[in-house]
Amino acid sequence: MLDRCDRVQIAVHDAAKAAQRFGQLLGSIVARRDHSRHLGARRTILAVGESEFELCEADGAGLTQDFLARRGEGLMTAGYCTADLDSMVKRWEGLGVAYDRDAEQLYLSPETTFGLPIVISESTYRPRVGPVSFLYETTNTLATNWRRVAAVYAGLFGLDPARFSEIGSERFGYVGTLTLFDPPNRLDRIELSQVTDDVHAMGRFVKTHGDSLYMCYVEVHDWAAVRGRLLEANARYTPRGSDPATDPDGGWVHPKELHGLLLGISRTGLAWDWSGREELVPSV
């Protein structure tokens, strides 16, 4: 029932300042502004490729203010979309799952989804903006057994476990799976990463926050342009290879550069390399 990764919601102190920074590094533009009752926030919504990043400023007491007080600026909510919100509601009500409907968005609390605050929006076509193509992954870091989480998500969202692709990394210290929604047509998924130690950054994060939302990933159709933006701004990022000035594939932008958001970036199709379909990776 989930079509794709649709958006993220980011808690910020100053949305105008954050919007300028995201535009500088990612070529995003402001699409609109509104208010969220559920989040207790004024939202500045950025068009980032085909996806949207919601910059959320606290508007009095509520979830956004609580997040900022507890964690500071950063990634607050993972967003996905479905073609039929009402069918999703019926599914959850049949399972006895609590949710909140705020205008045309459905929210699940992190207590329901293993530390992963989730918002579901209705699927809609949006023209691509800038050098980013789309958001395709949000990472649910886990102390809980990933197999249990995968089974729960399959039930909650009507996902097919036969499409999932197991993952693991000694470099980053985790095991888990990618809950791919529609392979091989699209990369969209929730990454379930159960940490294997508390030495690596991901493990340290889970030691502090428990089951949680860690980061997100975008695909770019013009990595050279994004890389150039990062270098021109002297923004801290870790390339997939050894040379930040010439790396052909992508990398990770440090949270301090994007108001607390740890952002992974990969060139077109590269992520199939670790998503169970290496044959789909285009050559550079």
Positions of the model-derived regions?
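N-terminal beta-strand motif that seeds the catalytic metal site of vicinal oxygen chelate
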Residues: 1-19, 75-80, 121-157, 162, ...
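An N-terminus-focused feature that recognizes amino-terminal "leader" regions
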Residues: 1-62, 99
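Vicinal oxygen chelate
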Residues: 4-13, 44-49, 54, 64-144, 173-194, 224-284, ...
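Amphipathic alpha-helical segments
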Residues: 14-29, 88-95, 144-161, 226-234
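N-terminal strand-loop-strand beta-hairpin
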Residues: 30-48, 107-112, 166-180
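Short, tandemly repeated low-complexity microdomains enriched for cysteine and small residues
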Residues: 33-35, 58, 64-69, 101-105, ...
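Aromatic-anchored, glycine/proline-accented short structural segments
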Residues: 146-197
